């Protein structure tokens, strides 16, 4: 009698452990998504830092909120909340001499990747730092965040 209950308990425990444990393929997928996010952020930063960008000084006047602490994928919620202001600043800066190709597509790609990485259940309330960041600082910090998470996955 007790043997059957014990075996059932063991079977359920094993099923729970195997279904909730991250697999190497999910880790690999996460790493690839982070690498794509990293490339998109770097592409925006490179476009902004382009020596031909006459509107860089204007772009630097816009401020972005940064989380106090960004160490886990759930903190990508804070990046997601700043995507619309980022897109607006990038659109304002478009000119004949400076044009980031497909700004809307880049922001859309970033948004999709962020949603997949942080998970749909995330309802994290971002705790923002007291100081704001320029667009360059903002992008650099999120690039560093991606690099740091990628390094923990490899």
UniProtKB/Swiss-Prot annotation:
The keyword Disulfide bond applies. It comes from the Eukaryota. This is Interleukin-2. Gene3D superfamilies: 1.20.1250.10. Belongs to the IL-2 family. The gene is IL2. It is found in: Secreted. GO terms for molecular function: cytokine activity; growth factor activity; interleukin-2 receptor binding. Residues 1-20 form the signal peptide. Glycans are attached at residue 23. Cytokine produced by activated CD4-positive helper T-cells and to a lesser extend activated CD8-positive T-cells and natural killer (NK) cells that plays pivotal roles in the immune response and tolerance. Binds to a receptor complex composed of either the high-affinity trimeric IL-2R (IL2RA/CD25, IL2RB/CD122 and IL2RG/CD132) or the low-affinity dimeric IL-2R (IL2RB and IL2RG). Interaction with the receptor leads to oligomerization and conformation changes in the IL-2R subunits resulting in downstream signaling starting with phosphorylation of JAK1 and JAK3. It comes from Papio anubis (Olive baboon). Disulfide bonds join 78-126. Its main location: secreted. Pfam families: IL2. One of its GO terms (biological process) is adaptive immune response. One of its GO terms (cellular component) is extracellular space. Keywords: Adaptive immunity, Cytokine, Disulfide bond, Glycoprotein, Growth factor, Immunity, Secreted, Signal.
């Amino acid at each position: 009698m007790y043997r059957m209950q014990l075996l059932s308990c063991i079977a359920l425990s094993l099923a729970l452990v195997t279904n909730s444990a991250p697999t190497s393929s999910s880790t690999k997928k996460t790493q690839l998504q982070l690498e794509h996010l990293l490339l998109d952020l770097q592409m925006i930063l490179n476009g902004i830092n382009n020596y031909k960008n006459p509107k860089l000084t204007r772009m630097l006047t816009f401020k972005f909120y940064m989380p106090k602490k960004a160490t886990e994928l759930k903190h990508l919620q804070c990046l997601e909340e700043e995507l619309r202001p980022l897109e607006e600043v990038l659109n304002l800066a478009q000119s004949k001499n400076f044009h980031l190709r497909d700004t809307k597509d880049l922001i859309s790609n970033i948004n999709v990747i962020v949603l997949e990485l942080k998970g749909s259940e995330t309802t994290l309330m971002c705790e923002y730092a007291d100081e704001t960041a320029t667009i360059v600082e903002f992008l650099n910090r999120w690039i560093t965040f991606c690099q740091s998470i990628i390094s923990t996955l490899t």
